A protein has these predicted regions:
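Sec-dependent signal peptide recognition
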Residues: 9-17
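Prokaryotic Sec-type signal peptides and long signal-anchor helices
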Residues: 18-19, 306
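C-terminal motif of bacterial Sec signal peptides marking the signal peptidase cleavage site
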Residues: 22-23
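Non-catalytic cap/lid and distal C-terminal segments of serine-dependent acyl enzymes
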Residues: 26-311
């Protein structure tokens, strides 16, 4: 550990200069800035890889200052290699650090990288809320999950594809094709992952949906039409024209979303949509459930293509 800290201390000025120069260029051209995050973004842990916080201006009405956390493989700045990208989405009342503070994403990712069980990739954790700058509420009132989900077919989708994905591809050495992009999330983020991939099958080759929020409660607020209507039409086109390279669906045995997630699984199975469905021994929460599911999914990503591409 001391040797690792010595190495980081030795090279920290280089990274600071590099990021400062990079930030100036980004600010001038894209209205964005990159920072080395403080200890809070690291959750008191010293990750193997490099953590960067990217702040940028949104292109849709509403929030103007957006943030995302980018976790780079340990050798990112020591090689010319290009890497696949995993976009990891939070749930309701979440934000860009939820996977860090509650999901211990650095520890889980590092353990798999260390053992060679997962492909090195860039992990991007954006804030996909569109209510108020980087917060999951509006005017001090938490939005209901059903209100949040309606926004995926609109501002969230547009901002995610045009702001987040395009920005990441322009700033980092990615492999900018569907075979090297994954989108995954939990709860509302799990639903958003399905929907984003269905709307953009040419962009996302891998989908991970953990306990996707699909609870209507009988309300007639447009959500039923959104989910049970044209989503499956979009998925039919997706699987016919641009089939995913991997589609992973999860729900806990004591998960409030288990019945509806099983419904998605059975409907996909009837329609011949290739996917994997797994149940884990937990409920709808972080208590080992989503953390272990994340590790299971990460081991499966980017296995169908050679990701060891050079510039």
């Amino acid at each position: 550990m001391h040797a690792k800290n010595d190495i980081m201390n030795k090279h920290l000025p280089f990274f600071l200069v590099l990021l400062t120069l990079f930030s100036c260029d980004i600010s001038r051209n894209r209205g964005s800035e990159m920072y080395l995050p403080g200890p809070a973004i690291r959750d008191g842990y010293s990750p193997m890889g490099l953590v960067e916080e990217l702040q940028y201006s949104g292109s849709v009405p509403g929030p103007t200052h957006r943030r995302m956390i980018v976790y780079l493989p340990p050798d990112y700045y020591r090689t010319e290699r290009r890497f696949p990208v995993l976009y990891l989405l939070h749930g309701a009342r979440g934000y860009e650090t939820s996977w860090i503070r509650k999901g211990h994403v650095y520890q889980s990712t590092d353990s798999l990288w260390r053992e060679g069980l997962a492909e090195p990739c860039i992990v991007v954790m954006p804030n996909v809320n569109q209510y108020k700058d980087d917060e999951d509420y509006e005017g001090g009132r938490f939005k209901g999950a059903w209100e949040s989900i309606l926004e995926v077919d609109g501002t969230v989708e547009y901002a995610f594809v045009h702001d987040v994905v395009n920005l990441v591809d322009s700033l980092y050495r990615t492999v900018p094709d569907k075979a090297h992009r994954a989108v995954a999330g939990l709860s509302i983020g799990g639903y958003q992952s399905i929907y984003l991939a269905a709307n953009h099958p040419d962009i996302f080759g891998y989908i991970g949906s953990m306990s996707p929020y699909t609870w209507c409660k009988g309300r007639d607020h447009g959500y039923r039409k959104l989910f049970y209507g044209h989503l499956y039409q979009k998925m039919a086109a997706q699987f016919a024209d641009e089939p995913p390279l991997g589609f992973y669906l999860y729900a806990g045995k004591w998960d409030i979303m288990l019945p509806s997630t099983q419904g998605i699984h059975h409907r996909m199975k009837r329609k011949g949509f290739s996917h994997e469905f797994s149940k884990y021994s937990a409920g709808h929460g972080w208590n080992n459930g989503w953390i272990e599911v994340y590790k299971d999914m990460l081991k499966k990503l980017f296995k169908n293509e050679d990701t060891n591409r050079n510039q």
